[in-house]
């Protein structure tokens, strides 16, 4: 019974519009950056004054590392050193396009551009060279008054023109590589083609310049799913050495390590990144909401996969302690707002210890009405699912159904899984299994990136089939789950149980250092 109570959602990503995918959920971090001197090496010939060179180049490296706050400060230093240096303003504007994180501060970017000139034409006229004008045209396209898909497509188009005119420009090639990941339009085949191109571009940058931060970083992003992850293992092992002062660079390798189930490496990466995040917050004297709670969530996931449950549970207490006293009516840092409940749910889901909820249904986290970002929508959707799940678990099927009724139309997997939980609570085994079969089928069309906010549906289906005395079918479900998310401990243990129940002999799965659960 304890195992059955671990039923959860396969991926919170299904709760969002089509263009917001796994990378938005799992490539997000605290809003603060953590940029020291060692950020990798960039070569960017430009027209700026001598005094502007160091801050500008440092800003470009920080931008490649997604250390947005510190990159912005560096570009502003370059502007102060040379007020007519257009590239510094275009660089600063890009720090507001945190699009892989689901954050788009276009108004702030436009305010930055206005410092350079009141119109696009006047700003482009201040470019120091034809090459810089092409950079400017791409950035200007990203912040036109249009919808985001149109803007990101125009940005990629501008960067493609730049790389065609200047094929040896590694900075342009790197920016094009990551820009292709912003574009979620078109068919699955078209999206796959963009991913393949992004991988090729990033690898070519890294091959030409092994210490380039963008080459390693963007290759990890592009390859962040089980199909492509092996192609980025070398980059994952190199990135933290390329930019050891970037907290993001310490964390990012774990995106690949999770995809191949390398739990020791996941833990090592995120222990270092969490320590760097805490050091940055302390040294800058900023609020603890600026901590990288994304890193903390990934660290806990590594602990959970190795069965280190006391260490994993302690991180719930860590989040609670560092966020004590925060006024959530004024703070709009989304990762911090939802951190404790994310950690609590993940712990219960992986360990089977639902006592962390004390037998009560948690309240939906209060949302800050000022923040309407896609990232906020993602976290609110995840929170709603988790509350609905716990409600069904304790038998409050009415509340579970009420919350599920608010899910977006595209939230097929979420809706099916809540319906399955409700059916199980009512003793309807046939509907329980049928709903999970539907969820599992739909999930096979989705990209799986990073730790799940909840259980993959094939694991849920395997649990249900095993409980219903259908172990051979459960074997297939667990095997499919491991194909989609390699080396997950719960799937491996479920598979072993199903094989025993079916009388199937098989080689013992590799150990994940996790103890078996009853």
Name each model-derived stretch.
Residues 84-86, 169-172, 211-213, 246, ...:
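Residue-level recognition of tetratricopeptide repeat
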Residues 65-73, 92-129, 137-150, 183-193, ...:
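Inter-helical turn/loop elements of alpha-helical hairpins
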Residues 50-77, 136, 140-144, 148, ...:
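Alpha-helical segment of the N-proximal tetratricopeptide repeat
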């Amino acid at each position: 019974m304890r195992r059955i109570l671990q039923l959860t959602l396969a991926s919170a990503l299904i709760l969002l519009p089509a263009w917001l995918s796994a990378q938005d959920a799992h490539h997000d971090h605290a809003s603060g950056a953590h940029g020291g001197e060692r950020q990798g090496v960039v070569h960017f010939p430009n027209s700026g004054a001598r005094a502007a060179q160091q801050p500008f180049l440092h800003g470009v490296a920080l931008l490649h590392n997604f250390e947005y706050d510190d990159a912005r400060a560096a570009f502003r230093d370059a502007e102060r050193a040379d007020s007519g240096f257009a590239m510094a303003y275009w660089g600063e504007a890009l720090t507001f396009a945190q699009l892989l994180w689901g954050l788009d501060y276009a108004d702030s970017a436009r305010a930055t551009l206005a410092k350079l000139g009141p119109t696009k034409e006047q700003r482009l006229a201040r470019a120091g060279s034809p090459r810089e004008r092409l950079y400017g045209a791409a950035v200007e396209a990203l912040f036109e008054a249009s919808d985001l898909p149109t803007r990101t497509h125009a940005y990629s188009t501008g960067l493609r023109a730049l790389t065609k005119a200047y094929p040896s420009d590694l900075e342009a090639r790197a920016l094009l590589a990551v820009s292709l990941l912003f574009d979620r339009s078109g068919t699955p085949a078209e999206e796959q083609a963009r991913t393949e191109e992004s991988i090729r571009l990033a690898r070519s940058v890294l091959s030409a310049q092994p210490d380039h931060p963008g080459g390693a970083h963007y290759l990890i992003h592009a390859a962040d799913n089980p199909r492509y992850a092996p192609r980025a293992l070398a980059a994952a092992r190199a990135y933290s050495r390329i930019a050891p002062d970037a907290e993001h660079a310490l964390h990012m390798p774990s995106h690949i390590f999770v995809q191949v189930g390398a739990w020791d490496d996941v833990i090592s990466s995120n222990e270092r990144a969490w320590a760097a995040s805490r050091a940055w917050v302390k040294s800058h004297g900023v609020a603890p909401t600026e901590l990288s709670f994304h890193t903390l969530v990934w660290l806990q996931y590594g602990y959970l996969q190795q069965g280190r449950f006391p260490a994993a549970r302690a991180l719930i207490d860590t989040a609670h302690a560092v966020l004590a006293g925060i006024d959530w009516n004024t703070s709009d840092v989304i990762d911090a707002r939802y951190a404790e409940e994310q950690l609590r749910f993940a712990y219960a889901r992986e360990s089977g210890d639902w006592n962390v909820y004390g037998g009560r249904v948690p309240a939906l986290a209060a949302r800050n009405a000022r923040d309407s970002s896609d990232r906020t929508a993602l976290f609110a959707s995840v929170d709603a699912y988790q509350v609905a799940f716990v409600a069904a678990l304790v038998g409050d099927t009415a509340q579970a159904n009420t919350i599920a009724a608010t899910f977006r139309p595209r939230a097929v997997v979420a809706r099916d899984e809540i319906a399955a939980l409700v059916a199980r609570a009512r003793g309807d085994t046939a509907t329980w299994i049928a709903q999970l079969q539907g969820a599992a089928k739909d999930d096979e069309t989705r990209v799986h990136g990073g730790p799940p906010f909840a259980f993959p549906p094939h694991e849920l289906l395997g649990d249900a089939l095993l409980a219903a005395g259908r172990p051979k079918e459960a074997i297939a479900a667990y095997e499919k789950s491991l194909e989609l998310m390699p080396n997950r401990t719960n799937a491996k243990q479920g598979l072993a149980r199903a094989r025993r129940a079916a009388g199937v002999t098989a080689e013992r799965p590799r150990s994940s250092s996790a103890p078996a659960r009853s």
